[in-house]
């Protein structure tokens, strides 16, 4: 197993500032559900998280400037693009930005996405369909998909079910993996990444990724030791070019995740593709920190 050079394609800011300002989208009930350590619940500084990355062998993490729901609706939240851009600028060898997208913002949202890519150097877009209560194939997302094609960036989105992130606002699970089928047909130039492994419809996610050359799977939010056997087999054999490693920190600890991958019994080449090579290719990331 490689001890360095890993790329984590899904990482959330979970610092004291984000916790204090209510920019995490989760409450104590959710943190209890995922067994998040109590000593870390007030947030983890970027510097401390970099130490975690170092111990895990993670070279670079893709940091999400989240846009979670219509801000006119209670409990929706965002992390400003500028916040993520500042961190990426401070640590350009360790972080790259992902621009959260919000279909309720219309043309301004498209301008924001363009600015994030062209001015801040963000490498992709990120969508939370359940926060907008619209499936990935809803027409309101299509202008965003078009803009991603124009900017030549991939877009990742949560597929599968969603948990109860907050007791006071329960979101519907709108992201069945099969909904990416229509999007992939309508936008053959768009790179789509279904994150959260599509659970509990993981085999459905595998089938969509195998059908379409522009659809990929992100393995975040579920500890590798609990991945379903069809996914592990897909990664190790015929789907080795279609799957990318992620944590969804703070949901999954990066040290645990990388260690778990090493226990899956993957062959060296598929494992390297999962942990590094596929992400480098799809997000056009530099091969080393010196580039």
What is each model feature region?
Residues 17-22, 75, 110, 167-170, ...:
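Short aromatic-enriched loop/helix-cap "lid" or pocket-rim segments at secondary-structure transitions
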Residues 14-17, 68-71, 103-106, 161-165, ...:
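Active-site environment of divalent metal-dependent phosphoester hydrolases
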Residues 6-9, 63-64, 98-99, 126, ...:
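Active-site neighborhood of phospho(di)ester-bond hydrolases with catalytic His/Asp-centered motifs
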Residues 1-60, 114-115, 239-244, 252-291:
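Mid-to-C-terminal alpha-helical segments outside catalytic/metal-binding sites
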């Amino acid at each position: 197993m490689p001890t360095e050079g890993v790329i984590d394609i899904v990482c959330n800011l979970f610092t004291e500032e984000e916790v204090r300002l209510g920019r995490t989208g989760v409450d104590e009930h959710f943190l209890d559900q995922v067994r998040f350590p109590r000593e870390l619940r007030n947030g983890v500084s970027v510097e401390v998280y970099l130490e975690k990355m170092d111990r895990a062998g993670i070279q670079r993490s893709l940091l999400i400037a989240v846009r979670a729901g219509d801000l006119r609706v209670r409990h929706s939240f965002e992390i400003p693009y500028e916040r993520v851009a500042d961190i990426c600028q401070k640590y350009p060898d360790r972080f790259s930005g992902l621009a959260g997208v919000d279909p309720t913002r219309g043309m301004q949202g498209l301008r924001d996405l363009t600015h994030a890519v062209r001015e801040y150097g963000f490498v992709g877009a990120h969508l939370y369909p359940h926060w907008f209560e619209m499936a990935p194939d809803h027409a309101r997302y299509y202008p965003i998909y078009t803009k991603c094609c124009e900017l030549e960036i991939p877009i990742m989105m949560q597929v599968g079910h969603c948990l109860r992130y907050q007791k006071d606002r329960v979101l519907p699970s709108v992201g069945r993996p099969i909904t990416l089928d229509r999007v992939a047909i309508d936008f053959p130039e768009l790179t789509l990444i279904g994150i959260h492994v599509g659970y509990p419809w993981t085999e459905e996610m595998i089938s969509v990724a195998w059908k379409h050359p522009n659809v990929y799977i992100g393995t975040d939010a579920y500890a590798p030791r609990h991945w379903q056997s069809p996914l592990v087999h897909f990664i190790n054999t015929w789907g080795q070019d279609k799957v990318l490693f992620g944590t969804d920190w703070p949901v999954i600890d990066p040290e645990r995740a990388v260690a778990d991958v090493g226990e899956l019994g993957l062959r060296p080449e598929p494992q390297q593709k999962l942990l590094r090579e596929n992400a480098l290719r799809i997000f056009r990331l530099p091969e080393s920190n010196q580039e």
